[in-house]
């Protein structure tokens, strides 16, 4: 049995660290390409390029169009080659960062991950989630290299809408349940080996941190405030969840998310919002007690996370083809098969409907 743990080379988190990116990146190369959508570009472009210039680095920018699709990756890779970039900086949300990772894989050089929201655990990982141009999950692309640098400006993250931090909490909560399932099944993690004890414990620490600080952090960011709880939750959503899911492993929750993306009705829900439905579904699949499942649903409701299919856009579950979701969740390449028992599409469909009913009952009582 071979256990594997991998991580980024450097992780930096703090107030206003955007202006320090040049200091941290100067040893990585000579010419940087900033990849971000228009909103993020307006927020950080001048600070990033000023810091790069102060460190003696050349820099240029390209606007990310919104989907981490194969076509978008090819387009931006072409820009990187034309600009002679040997550092790719991905800034923004998970899809921008995953696109930047894929571009680095194609053109070589170094990669800097610069999340402006703490809505997911993509910043630290060595994989990209690939979607169609219409937002449907297609594949995971795995890489040998992690980001060389992850830099998280807590001022920027706290100023983003609270929904993003809330979404990241949902993604982070799933990390523990999935890593624990993989540990029980003896399955593989996301970096090519069996989970390490460190990966498992980091996933558990992520869960404990979010339970302890989640509500307070959400209160703070409603006022764009950075507190100890905000710092703790940003680290949990980004670093602990990222290391925990890669080196601990994924199971049913993210497979259910991937299945849900097949329905256009869910495309306005964030990654984490769909994952939260996946977590409740996983708990049902695994046969946890009603009390355990209801306790998780109650905490989700306290944080404002979705606990029913209606809250992620599926207003009439009985009239929607949930078999499409279940079949996609059980694709042979999916991590749902790292659960400690065999899972079938019929089981997933029934668990989704049961999770939805339990969520509605607990939310409305």
UniProtKB/Swiss-Prot annotation:
Record text on cofactor binding: Binds 1 zinc ion per subunit.
Organism of derivation: Halobacterium salinarum (strain ATCC 700922 / JCM 11081 / NRC-1)
Catalytic activity as recorded in UniProt: ethylene glycol + NAD(+) = glycolaldehyde + NADH + H(+)
Keywords from the UniProt entry: Metal-binding, NAD, Oxidoreductase, Plasmid, Zinc
Binding site for NAD(+): 37, 94-95, 116, 119, 125, 127, 131
Family: Belongs to the iron-containing alcohol dehydrogenase family.
Classification via Pfam families: Fe-ADH
Residues noted as binding Zn(2+) in the record, renumbered to the chain: 171, 254, 271
Function of the molecule: Oxidoreductase involved in the non-carboxylating pentose bisphosphate pathway, a nucleoside degradation pathway present in some halophilic archaea. Catalyzes the reduction of glycolaldehyde to ethylene glycol. Cannot catalyze the oxidation of glycerol 1-phosphate nor the reduction of dihydroxyacetone phosphate (DHAP).
EC number: 1.1.1.-
GO molecular function annotations of the record: glycerol dehydrogenase (NAD+) activity; metal ion binding
Regulation of its function: Is subject to substrate inhibition.
The name this protein goes by in its record: Glycolaldehyde reductase
Entry superkingdom: Archaea
Activity-pH dependence: Optimum pH is around 6.
Cofactor entry: Zn(2+)
PROSITE patterns listed in its UniProt record: ADH_IRON_2 (PS00060)
InterPro entries: ADH_Fe/GldA, ADH_Fe_CS, Glycerol_DH
Temperature-related activity annotation: Optimum temperature is 40 degrees Celsius.
């Amino acid at each position: 049995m071979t256990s594997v743990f991998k991580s980024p080379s450097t992780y930096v988190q703090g107030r206003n660290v955007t202006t320090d990116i040049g200091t941290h990146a100067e040893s990585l190369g000579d010419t940087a390409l900033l990849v971000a959508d228009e909103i993020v570009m307006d927020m950080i472009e001048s600070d990033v390029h000023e810091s790069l210039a102060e460190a003696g680095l050349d820099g240029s920018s390209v606007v990310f169009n919104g989907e981490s699709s194969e076509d978008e990756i090819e387009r931006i890779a072409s820009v990187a080659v034309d600009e002679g970039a040997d550092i790719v900086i991905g800034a923004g949300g998970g899809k921008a960062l995953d696109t930047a990772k894929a571009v680095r894989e194609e053109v070589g050089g170094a990669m800097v991950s610069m999340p402006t929201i703490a809505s997911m655990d993509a910043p630290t990982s060595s994989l990209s989630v690939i979607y169609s141009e219409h937002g449907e999950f297609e594949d995971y692309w795995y890489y040998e290299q992690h980001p060389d640098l992850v830099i998280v400006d807590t001022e920027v993250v706290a100023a983003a809408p609270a929904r993003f931090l809330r979404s990241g909490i949902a993604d982070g909560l799933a990390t523990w349940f999935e890593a624990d399932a993989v540990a029980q099944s003896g399955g593989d993690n996301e970096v090519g080996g069996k989970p390490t004890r460190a990966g498992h414990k980091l996933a558990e620490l992520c869960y404990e941190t979010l339970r302890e600080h989640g509500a307070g952090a959400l209160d703070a960011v409603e006022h764009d405030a950075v507190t100890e709880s905000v710092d703790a939750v940003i680290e949990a959503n980004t670093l602990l969840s990222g290391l925990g899911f890669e080196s601990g492993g994924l199971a049913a929750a993210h497979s259910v998310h991937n299945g849900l993306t097949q329905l256009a009705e869910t495309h306005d829900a964030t990654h984490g919002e769909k994952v939260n439905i996946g977590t409740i579904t996983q708990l049902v699949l695994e046969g946890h007690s009603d009390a355990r499942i209801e306790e998780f649903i109650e905490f989700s409701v306290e944080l404002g996370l979705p606990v029913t299919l209606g809250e992620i856009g599926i207003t009439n579950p009985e009239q929607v083809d949930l078999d499409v979701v279940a079949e996609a969740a059980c694709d042979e390449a999916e991590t749902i098969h790292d659960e400690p028992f065999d899972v079938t599409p019929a089981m997933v469909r029934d668990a989704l409907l049961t999770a939805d009913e339990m969520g509605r009952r607990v939310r409305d009582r």
